[in-house]
C-alpha cells in the first residue's frame, strides 16, 4: 500500500490496514524500560549550520521539505550510527489540538507535534536514519520560522513553494548529547523496517499559531489534516537505549 492511504481510523485505507511487522514505528518510550548507555561518541551534524533552500510541498499527508543539495550536504554520523547518512527530506506530524500530534509517545503522552529529519545511507542507501524532534508549546517559534512564512501557500494538496535560508541547526534542541535510539520502520506506508531512529530527549518550542497553520493544510480530499500521526506499535523484542554523550 503505497498509493492511496489515510490517517482516518474508519477508512478502508486507514492505519489499521497498513503493512505491519515486528519492528514497526512509532513506539511508546517507557522510561522504566529504557537502557542507559554513556558514551564519548555523540552524533556529529555536518553542515547543519549552513543555510539550505529547496521545495516545500503539501503532499496530501504532511508538509515536507526536500533540500536542493549542492556541495555542502547536511549529513550525520557517529553516535552509534553504522555509516554516514545524508539528509533527503524533513516533514512534520501534528494533531487536532495542542495535547496531541507527535507520533512517538513518552510515557503514553504525546507532544503537540513532531519533526522528522530523514537521512539516507551514503554507503548503503537501503538504510535510513531518522532524527525525531518533539515540538512543545512555547512563546518562541524560531524552529519553524521558515515554514510559518509559507504554510499559508500550502493549504491545497499537491501545492509546492520555495523556502530559502533554512538553518537545520535551529530545528534541533540545545542538548544534542541525549537521545533515545531504537531500530524501527517508516511510519507511513509501505512501513519498511529499514530505519535507525534517534529521538532527542529535549524538545524544541513552537507557538500555538504555528501549529494552527499546519491544521489548515488540506489532504487529497480537500479536508483539513487535523491529525497525521500513526498509532504507536508494539515494541516486541526490541530495546530502547538512552544514549548520553559525555
Curated annotation (Swiss-Prot):
SMART domains referenced in this protein's UniProt entry, alphabetically: Carb_anhydrase
Annotated PROSITE patterns: ALPHA_CA_1, ALPHA_CA_2
Xref: InterPro entries: CA_dom (IPR001148), CA_dom_sf (IPR036398), Carbonic_anhydrase_a-class (IPR023561), Carbonic_anhydrase_a-class_CS (IPR018338)
Cofactor names: Zn(2+)
Active-site residue numbers: 61 (proton acceptor)
Top-level taxon of origin: Eukaryota
Chain residues that bind Zn(2+): 91, 93, 116
CDD domains referenced in this protein's UniProt entry, alphabetically: alpha_CA (cd00326)
Annotated catalysed reactions: hydrogencarbonate + H(+) = CO2 + H2O
UniProt xrefs under PANTHER family: CARBONIC ANHYDRASE
UniProt similarity note: Belongs to the alpha-carbonic anhydrase family.
Role summary: Reversible hydration of carbon dioxide.
Protein name, UniProt field: Putative carbonic anhydrase 3
Organism: Caenorhabditis elegans
Amino acid at each position: 500500500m503505497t498509493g492511496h492511504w489515510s490517517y482516518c481510523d474508519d477508512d478502508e485505507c486507514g492505519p489499521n490496514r497498513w503493512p505491519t511487522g515486528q519492528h514497526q514505528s512509532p513506539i511508546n518510550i517507557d522510561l522504566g524500560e529504557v537502557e542507559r548507555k554513556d558514551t564519548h561518541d555523540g552524533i556529529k551534524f555536518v553542515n547543519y549550520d549552513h543555510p539550505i533552500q529547496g521545495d516545500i510541498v503539501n503532499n496530501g499527508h504532511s508538509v515536507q521539505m526536500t533540500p536542493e543539495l549542492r556541495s555542502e550536504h547536511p549529513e550525520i554520523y557517529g553516535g552509534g550510527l553504522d555509516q554516514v547518512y545524508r539528509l533527503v527530506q524533513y516533514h512534520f506530524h501534528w494533531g487536532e489540538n495542542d495535547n496531541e500530534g507527535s507520533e512517538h509517545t513518552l510515557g503514553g503522552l504525546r507532544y503537540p507535534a513532531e519533526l522528522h529529519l530523514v537521512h539516507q545511507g551514503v554507503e548503503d542507501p537501503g538504510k535510513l536514519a531518522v532524527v525525531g524532534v518533539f515540538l512543545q508549546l512555547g512563546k518562541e517559534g524560531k524552529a519553524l520560522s521558515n515554514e510559518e512564512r509559507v504554510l499559508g501557500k500550502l493549504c491545497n494538496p499537491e501545492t509546492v513553494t520555495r523556502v530559502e535560508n533554512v538553518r537545520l541547526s535551529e530545528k534541533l534542541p540545545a542538548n544534542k548529547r541525549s537521545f533515545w535510539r531504537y531500530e524501527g520502520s517508516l511510519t507511513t506506508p509501505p512501513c519498511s523496517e529499514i530505519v535507525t531512529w534517534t529521538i532527542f530527549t529535549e524538545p524544541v518550542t513552537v507557538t500555538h499559531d504555528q501549529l494552527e497553520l499546519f491544521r489548515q493544510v488540506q489532504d487529497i480530499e480537500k479536508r483539513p489534516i487535523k491529525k497525521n500521526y500513526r498509532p504507536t506499535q508494539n515494541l516486541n523484542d526490541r530495546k530502547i537505549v538512552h544514549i548520553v554523550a559525555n
